[in-house]
């Protein structure tokens, strides 16, 4: 079966919320429900889901080759922006013209793009060797560079969650008898009966301290 995780799609978030957290009222899927929404951007939906679609036969080889070519163009452009360094003499007139702080030393095009007020489109004025990219590809290049640090932290959180998913919770656990586990957490865990530590960590009312108690109880801490 094809199982989409919380870090791969909003439908994965929706299913996980309904199965693990439950709901007493109509459920509305909003971006705020995802802790990984920086990874679940509109502009990178194809990079997240096309490989999965190809794997299960929903995407044919011709379309997948087009996808790979697009990803190669995006990757090459990000590399070019990182490696293209401009001197203050080259960049400062442009920066001052848009009200940005001028450079004191050389900076790459990627460094300039990381400034909140500068867009990829604006950089065309001082970027003579820019290749042709579609609007969609330009948006992905800009988003990937601007939010790289934040995305890296979220990817770290995803890896941590995957590791927690490997820790299974026995079905027979008496949560109310675990010393150090808060009453609210014990009640929620007893009612929902998560299958893994990862699922337990996603339950509203179960905090990181409760997860630490569970790991100690299981001898995994």
Residue positions per predicted region:
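Active-site-proximal substrate-binding core of FAD-dependent oxidoreductases
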Residues: 1-26
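Phosphate/diphosphate-binding loops
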Residues: 17, 26-28, 54-56, 60
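Alpha-helical protein-protein interaction elements
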Residues: 2, 19, 28, 139-142, ...
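Extended, charge-enriched "interface" segments that sit outside catalytic cores
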Residues: 7, 33, 39-41, 45, ...
